[in-house]
Amino acid sequence: MKNRKALALIAVLALVIAACGGSDGGSDDAVEEVVETTEAPAEEAPTTTAAPEPAGDPLVLASLMPLSGDLAALGPGIALGAALAVQQINAAGGINGVPVELIEGDSGCDGAIALDSLTEAIAGGAQGVMGAACSGTSLAILDTAIAAEVVMVSPSNTSPQFTKMDKKGFYARTAPSDLLQGDVLASLLLEDGVESISIISRADAYGRGLAEATASALSLIHI
């Protein structure tokens, strides 16, 4: 039963994350053209049924994005996208008729900041978390989320460590592992005829993971 609930929450979180980006590309001209077309006929316009208002106890989700720190330029936009997605989901009737509430929290790119925000979100009834953005930050708070049976879905964690961990069904990510990035980088260097290389990386979980994956892939092709 717990696994079914976790899978359902992962699906909902992935839906919200996916809804954070993209647009329909429509224009005001297109809207005006449709309005003119519908006003011209004398026939009765078809009736439309509005989506029912979501009711019942809300599904509480939390957004843990870097609103401070090194990635503060990226976090607010992602958080706003998540808030818009939740607004659109509720306007369409919620999730199976249940409204969605969103708690916005700051993860920084710092485990301590993220843990404080996660603790507050759990106290506020959060059942699922979007985030964190940084691999090291998610690694620092994942055990707490698992212990509370709160699902985490990250849009950007790439550390290979997550693949090997026992996540007990409470973690997923929508970004590929650095192992894949390492293979691609090695292939590009081979195509460019590079024979030797030095690797400089960030001193965090993301940087170390990508550097190790790239070095491993390079060793297989003798660079």
Positions of predicted regions on the chain:
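Extracellular mucin-like PTS domains
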Residues: 30-52
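Bacterial lipoprotein signal-peptidase II cleavage site
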Residues: 21-31
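Extracytoplasmic "Venus flytrap"
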Residues: 52-55, 59-83, 105-112, 133-136, ...
